[in-house]
């Protein structure tokens, strides 16, 4: 008699046999089968991501089903056009769009604006979840301010030390020459070092020739702010956190030297690379906003219980408030000194005049958050739309959103990561795309690409645009171009940053209107050349819809999105032959 097999073992054996049968007959099942040696932690992570993806898919299906029922209720399902060509009708009803552009161009900000316009309830549900991200952006801005001013004072110290050494060596050389001279010679007293100047420099430098922390007490806050930022990033699940904020001493020295060089450069308009972007792992929206909604529900439904706990001396704070309390405690403690630096410090004013804290120059809108420091750290703080729009979170991978624009139009929008390393992942999402919104940050005309410091950011944008308009898969897609960060471009030009210094082919005036129109013409020429290469006739040529944008301006983007909708309608009518 064969040995008995326990029930769990039998079920496991049958399961493996079933999988083997499926694998032999179904290539898709073979491709999707998890690794045989999958670790428990990897399995848990995979199942969690599959669960989130399934929930998202079910939500979209429910949304589309509800929309179809609404159409049937209004008698639209039986219209001749839908019954004759249901596929084309569905294609026109669910309109596929993709947001393209390099990292930091403003794609995610535009997507936030779309959610605010087309799905206000979802935007409102997520509002509470942005609190921690806003606090992280504020913390990063504080660190940027303190470290930049530290380097500024360090640079001044180096200059004074160099000047003192020069004066001392000059005095020594003069004394030696006078003592060894065999006959008296005329001495130029005007070229002699000024003793008063030398004494003043020596007094300022002191014996250590280091920054006097007693005169700059805010320097002592830098380690605690760095530690707080690291903790917030870790809590949010920032990608690559160890590589970002744990640089070696050699790397830190190199970074400091680069910043010193930029501080010393005349006409420099930004400090680049002073902070790393907040790159969160895939699924951060579900984790953060689901937690925020749960906390909000607990807060709303448990007010009576909270009041009782408070009466009994218990802690009445919600989970979210507890998590943020330590952050707020530190930010409130250093607030007076930071605001005094930001508003009154002479060195900070000098750097601000040179544009070193210009919003959009880095991944944090530094000046925006510092200007709103007091409001954000208030006890009754609640993120505003402006706070959410200015908060920077870099997209990792691809996110998909579905918005009902009106009864007959739904946008399915893909937001893809724009860094060079992520562009290879775009291809699967470009199939059957009907419209492309391409964002070009014009204010980056004088900035290097983060991934390659030898490449100009805007030059990389033109290269990317050329690759898109020459892609055969996208030859029928409507092209919509957002010339973004136009306000920062105007500020730079007014501050005297010369375009021809970075773009020698530009020969016009350093005038805002002339500059942005010149860039618009370059994009149009790029599209025209791409179509000339494939010998398109005049009737088949695409129109490039161009808009100058400030992605954080809700009023402007709302008007532009309405214009985009009209452009889409116009292109659809053209395809049906109803318009020429």
UniProtKB/Swiss-Prot annotation:
This is Guanine nucleotide-binding protein alpha-4 subunit. Residues 1-28, 160-196, 302-325 are annotated as: Disordered. It comes from Mycosarcoma maydis. Pfam families: G-alpha. InterPro entries: Gprotein_alpha_su, GproteinA_insert, P-loop_NTPase. Keywords: GTP-binding, Magnesium, Metal-binding, Nucleotide-binding, Transducer. The lineage of its organism: Eukaryota, Fungi, Dikarya, Basidiomycota, Ustilaginomycotina. GTP binds at residues 101-108, 389-395, 415-419, 484-487, 551. Residues 480-487 are annotated as: G4 motif.
